[in-house]
Amino acid sequence: MIFITLEHILAHISFSLISVVTLAYWGTLVHQIEGLSSSGGKGMIVTFVCTTGLLITRWLYSGHLPLSNLYESFMFLSWSSSVIHIILEVRSQKDRGLGAITAPSTMLTHGFATSGLPKEMQQSAMLVPALQSHWLMMHVSMILLSYATLLCGSLSSIAFLIITFRRNRRILSLLSARDNSFIWPFPSRNNLYLHEQEKSDLQNTFYLSFTNHRKCKLTQQLDYWSYRVIGLGFLLLTIGILSGAVWANEAWGSRWSWDPKETWALITWIIFAIYLHTRVNKGWQDENPAIIASLGSFIVWICYLGVDLLGIGLHSYGWLI
């Protein structure tokens, strides 16, 4: 009873903290307050500690690694996102753009686990005999870590596409406005108005140049880290699939059975393999790999939740709805 109460307290504290942290990172994108960004980083560390304590507490009273149902997998996914956030904070020298992506991911997965799932699915239960294996920790943890990593990299690619599209559209609209302007050679009231319009366009050009420099730097950082994070996620997914094949061979005598989860895991692996191939292909650069990564985020969610929506297969946690 004490462990269950402690788990609920840690769940509420961690969700409250990550909600405040998300608002802090979004605020830094608008106002660029350095202290706010630093507070967000510290808040994420406290969130990580609370979520770690929650998982350890559940491990102690359940007697097994908390990866046996949908609630536990979502909490582990949220924990993984916080780990990725902290690593990126250190490696990217506290870049605000990345924090504004990883913090909401942590908040949404945590919130869905605690508030979106029915209480029956949040209860801990004994493991079925097939799951009572040392491969549970290796296989499931690697798969969930890969999901969190691939989603983080894919969301960075989506943000890269959005910023690039809006920047290009603004440049085209300004150039179109300037090309359509015509200065009448004789002095008139309209002529003075057009000169004022040209002056305004010039001011907009300077402002656009400044903002484009910031956006260009941000898109470069998003593209840089998206590539590296997805590369790590691809490696983790490969390890997870291989360890699952070994476990399946020990449990059922078959390494691959084309279970729905296995099939979608293979599709996910192929999509991100194509993404990594396009990154080394000079003919496919800029937005093209980002589009593939964006598709990959959709595929990851199908792989993760699709089986539960169908309610079939050996990997199903049961009906989600």
UniProtKB/Swiss-Prot annotation:
Subcellular compartments: Plastid, Chloroplast thylakoid membrane
Transmembrane intervals: 1-21, 36-56, 70-90, 97-117, 143-163, 229-249, 256-276, 290-310
Pfam families: Cytochrom_C_asm (PF01578)
Cellular component annotations (GO), alphabetically ordered: chloroplast thylakoid membrane; plasma membrane
One of the record's GO molecular function terms: heme binding
Keyword Transport: no
InterPro entries linked to this entry: Cyt_c_assembly, Cyt_c_biogenesis_CcsA, Cyt_c_biogenesis_CcsA/CcmC
GO biological process: cytochrome complex assembly
Keyword entries, A-Z: Chloroplast, Cytochrome c-type biogenesis, Membrane, Plastid, Thylakoid, Transmembrane, Transmembrane helix
Membrane topology: Multi-pass membrane protein
NCBIfam families with a match to the protein in the record: cytochr_II_ccsB
Subunit structure, as described in the record: May interact with Ccs1.
Function: Required during biogenesis of c-type cytochromes (cytochrome c6 and cytochrome f) at the step of heme attachment.
Family per record: Belongs to the CcmF/CycK/Ccl1/NrfE/CcsA family.
Protein name from the UniProt record: Cytochrome c biogenesis protein CcsA
Organism: Cycas taitungensis (Prince sago)
